[in-house]
């Protein structure tokens, strides 16, 4: 109850880097708030998935392992999060600002009538004073993101509704293992109790994925130029 939750995106049986980055940040937020960090993994063939997740300081991992949960489709994953959150009542939920996160986040937020800030670049814990009503809110999630075309940086808070939800851009948080031997609880849940048969109305027949030619996110130095460079030879240094 009232913990920090991270939705883990899974490609096959591998947790996405953006989710591991959010687990790192989620652990820090949970330490500040004095609560637990919990994670959600939903997919197919997830035996041993806790080995990837628990070292990031996860106190409880909720595992939904069943055919039809991978590849990702909207309705089953939405039902899982909405129904789980009604039970667990988290105060914060984080997910990646990816194709999946941008689809899933608004669906869950709308179903729970909670606030969602998209494409955050920074997350902090702080106090908010509602001067109009004379109310001070403690330990709110500061959801920080560029606004108005990147001309300003906005800090957004959600004082009333829970969970406070945010999607976070990949690569802006640092991925760090908290404790390689961290002992967390693994809870294996029955997806049938959270997802109805009608949620599986969409079936993925085939997927065509193009591999990235260069790992820009993992580069320590990036050299960029426009049309003025003339040719690729002019990039030689």
Annotate each predicted stretch with a short phrase:
Residues 1-237:
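N-terminal glycine-rich FAD/FM-binding segment characteristic of electron-transfer flavoproteins
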């Amino acid at each position: 109850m009232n913990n920090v939750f991270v939705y883990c995106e899974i490609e096959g049986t591998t947790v996405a880097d953006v989710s591991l980055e959010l687990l790192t940040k989620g652990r820090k937020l949970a330490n500040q708030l004095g609560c637990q960090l919990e994670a959600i993994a939903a997919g197919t063939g997830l035996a041993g998935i806790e080995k990837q997740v628990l070292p990031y300081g996860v106190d409880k991992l909720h595992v939904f392992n069943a055919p039809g949960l991978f590849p990702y489709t909207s309705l089953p994953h939405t039902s899982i999060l909405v129904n789980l959150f009604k039970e667990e009542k988290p105060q914060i939920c984080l997910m990646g600002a990816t194709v999946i996160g941008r689809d899933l986040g608004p669906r869950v937020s709308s179903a729970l009538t909670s606030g969602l800030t998209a494409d955050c670049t920074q997350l902090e814990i702080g106090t908010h004073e509602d001067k109009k009503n004379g109310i001070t809110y403690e330990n709110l999630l500061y959801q920080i993101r560029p606004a108005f075309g990147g001309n300003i940086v906005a800090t957004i808070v959600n004082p009333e509704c829970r969970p406070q939800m945010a999607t976070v851009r990949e690569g802006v948080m640092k991925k760090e293992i908290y404790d390689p031997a961290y002992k967390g609880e693994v809870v294996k849940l029955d997806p049938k109790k959270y997802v109805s048969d009608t949620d599986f109305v969409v079936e993925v027949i085939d997927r065509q994925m193009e591999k990235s030619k260069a790992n820009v996110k993992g580069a320590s130095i990036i050299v960029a130029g426009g049309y003025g460079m003339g040719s690729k030879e002019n990039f030689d240094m």
